[in-house]
Amino acid sequence: MADDESRTILLEKNEDCPGCIIDRTKQQQRGVPYLHLSFIWLVSLCTALPISSLFPYIYFMIRDFHIAKQEEDIGFYAGFVGSSFMIGRALTSIFWGKLADRYGRKPIILIGTFSVIIFNTLFGLSTSFWLAISVRFLLGCFNCLLGVIRAYASEVVSEEYNALSLSVVSTSRGIGLILGPAIGGYLAQPAEKYPNIFSQSSVFGRFPYFLPSLVISVYATAVLIACWWLPETLHTRCRIAQGRLNPTELNDDESRGGGLDEQKIINKPSLLRNRPLMAIIIVYCVFSLQEIAYNEIFSLWAVSDRSYGGLSFSSQDVGEVLAISGLGLLVFQLLVYPPLEKSVGLLAVIRLSAVLLIPLLSCYPYIALLSGVTLHLVINCASIIKNALSISLVTGLFIMLNKAVPQNQRGAANGISMTAMSVFKSFGPAGGGVLFSWAQKRQDATFLPGQIFAPCDEMVFLVLNLVQLVGLILTFIPYISQIQ
């Protein structure tokens, strides 16, 4: 062999190796692996619910802490509580990813699920701002589920169902981001909303934000119990032998689904030098920033007054839009995305989705000119299409990220992506809120007005489209096409 061929470590089959066992199961299994997909769905939902459940009541929670000297300061403190989770996750995602690559996916999933039970419950029992922000930060530090479950989803099913398994992660996460606010909105302050059921002297009267946290923690407990039967996918008990192999053979083996024939390679080059991986992570971060900024802006825009270009929706109206779009998202991901990805390819789906989102977002300000049934019909259709395109982007990037690295580095690779994404997402909500407020204050300004051609917040959606355009351009980085 040539001198530049790298020294690698080879793993031979072992009857007791959990990774080898799952590989044999994949080879023997026929049909859709519903059991494995169910595990993936449950864990993905568990990681999404705590993130979004506090948004409907965080304003009132901060108000009841009496830390804000005036009402205008409540949003300032609420922003710190919201961002503390992402900061904690950004600090520890790489650490958890490396542990998952060393000790396996299952123990890390169990730790992450258990942390939801503990810290999410404590958050609902918080009686001060500093306790709430500390518990939220710790929840982010131990919430290692999303990155690990993405790596797990790509390994537990055969190559044929890879797109389906990762689309289940995206769909469950999307549903969780819709169910979370519903749980928080309906169950917070139950003694005030449902006095016939909950008295002011009960624990739910003394801790008005405990019930939504308790419901999510009970669900997390059920997931923790179910995960005891979760099969491990990491090759942890194979015999190690030194050998030489051309690095291209590793990529060829992984592209065939990561299964073991006679030997399995473990090679750990620096992930930071993996240019296709770094390119995918950069694109993922840009689209994640745009997505979370849109989520923040959409809620503010929908409930704002029509004089500011909003829809004058109630919280119930917004909830209905989110619920309908969530149902449409579920149908799209399970029935439409897998055959679409197979027919046109991953990169084509990502680029097509990014292109179509730009004219769609450009239409949003003009939807505010509608009213009545027409308004509700159009905004629901637009929301379904927007979520379907966004999830197509995310799912495609998930798959390409896992294809960019061998199995024994997928945990660390997803940890790096989670760290970078969490950093970007920590700026998204605050940036989106500032942008929205700035645009509303400049409705009639002569320079960079909030409205341009119509009494709508066009400037807000213009900025969102600029971020979307940057992400689209970045998909043409040459290294990304190498993953196909």
Swiss-Prot record:
UniProt KW keywords: Membrane, Transmembrane, Transmembrane helix, Transport
Lineage of producing organism: Eukaryota, Viridiplantae, Streptophyta, Embryophyta, Tracheophyta
Membrane topology term: Multi-pass membrane protein
Protein's UniProt name: Probable peptide/nitrate transporter At3g43790
InterPro entries according to UniProt: MFS, MFS_dom, MFS_trans_sf
PROSITE patterns: MFS (PS50850)
GO MF assignments: transmembrane transporter activity
BP term (GO), one: response to nematode
Gene from which the chain derives: ZIFL2
